[in-house]
Amino acid sequence: MKCLGKRRGQAAAFLPLCWLFLKILQPGHSHLYNNRYAGDKVIRFIPKTEEEAYALKKISYQLKVDLWQPSSISYVSEGTVTDVHIPQNGSRALLAFLQEANIQYKVLIEDLQKTLEKGSSLHTQRNRRSLSGYNYEVYHSLEEIQNWMHHLNKTHSGLIHMFSIGRSYEGRSLFILKLGRRSRLKRAVWIDCGIHAREWIGPAFCQWFVKEALLTYKSDPAMRKMLNHLYFYIMPVFNVDGYHFSWTNDRFWRKTRSRNSRFRCRGVDANRNWKVKWCDEGASMHPCDDTYCGPFPESEPEVKAVANFLRKHRKHIRAYLSFHAYAQMLLYPYSYKYATIPNFRCVESAAYKAVNALQSVYGVRYRYGPASTTLYVSSGSSMDWAYKNGIPYAFAFELRDTGYFGFLLPEMLIKPTCTETMLAVKNITMHLLKKCP
């Protein structure tokens, strides 16, 4: 096709059209996140001895790896499953070190950029903003999620009320959906998703939960009982600034986006910023670390807003559920110490039944137990804070998977993940209504 006409003026006018046409014909020419992850790898290793663990921690620190699992290099010890994202310019050095030290490893993701683009539909031309045909089996941007919330608030006013509890560091509204049949005195359940920005399956589940509640309210006796007897306060995206940043700049961003007066590094771990054994074991005081606890408890506007809301309503809120990824675990207090909670039997029974219900769908197994022994010790967590502040049922879900995809859980796994998790949440809620005060 010739784009140039006889006259230069006409040719100049047609050049932009030709360029656009060629871009459409070659969609692979542009890459997500400016191709920043090309050649990056995700590598798993499990140190067999403390000597290996020490050596791995040292090389990981030197190469500035992005730790996927566990959340801090300090957790790496003998037998710890460790997944690291290593940039292309450091992968050769890391692999050479592992081979020379005779440390066994496995490359989980050979090229992070290719995996990212293959497993995501961010670069397609699908109409993702059509609220009438909202697709719950794809990941949605913050703008799309908040538009969806506004839409539900208008179209389902009998069961949904939307409100804001404050603003984020960058000025974004912190929206909540109050779900349930309206009544004066009702117990409540709090659900939040997306405390850590890169854990996209969390917000996907929060949306799925709302969808299922609205669709099955009339047909499912259990759901009808839940919404008639309880309110659900649902925060689909807790860390709104970080989540937005993970869509526009860095897919694997974890923290909030607050600035630090002394360091160029931005953000605080919103799950280390709560006033419960703040900045103790499992949290970092360095602003550049992913587990940075912040300059003081509740320093982050997002954490402060949620803490204030929970404090105000703690007499009625009987359960706190927070959704994370990845590990396939259902955790309960304590995170910050090795100790048994007073209502252990009730909470442990609920967790046991929840993971069994979850497994009954697709056979996916979740570990369950106190966070400190099942995962690792961490201080300043939202779950521990909720429990310490009078909410007797406090759980944290670590959703799929166990590392094959990690934070890049494909969209084709959203439906099965949310379907099985829905059963677990319903089980916990019904257990709360039947047995525990």
Curated annotation (Swiss-Prot):
Its EC number is 3.4.17.-. Its cofactor is Zn(2+). Disulfide bonds join 265-288. The keyword rRNA processing does not apply. Gene3D superfamilies: Metallocarboxypeptidase-like, Zn peptidases. It is found in: Secreted, Extracellular space, Extracellular matrix. InterPro entries: CPAH, M14A-like_propep, M14A_act_pep, Peptidase_M14. GO terms for molecular function: metallocarboxypeptidase activity; zinc ion binding. Keywords: Carboxypeptidase, Chromosomal rearrangement, Cleavage on pair of basic residues, Disease variant, Disulfide bond, Epilepsy, Extracellular matrix, Glycoprotein, Hydrolase, Metal-binding, Metalloprotease, Protease, Secreted, Signal, Zinc, Zymogen. Optimum pH is 8. Expressed in the hippocampus, nucleus raphe, and cortex. Glycans are attached at residues 89, 153, 427. Its main location: secreted. Belongs to the peptidase M14 family. May be involved in the proteolytic inactivation of enkephalins and neurotensin in some brain areas. May convert inactive angiotensin I into the biologically active angiotensin II. Releases a C-terminal amino acid, with preference for large hydrophobic C-terminal amino acids and shows only very weak activity toward small amino acids and histidine. This is Carboxypeptidase A6. It comes from Homo sapiens (Human).
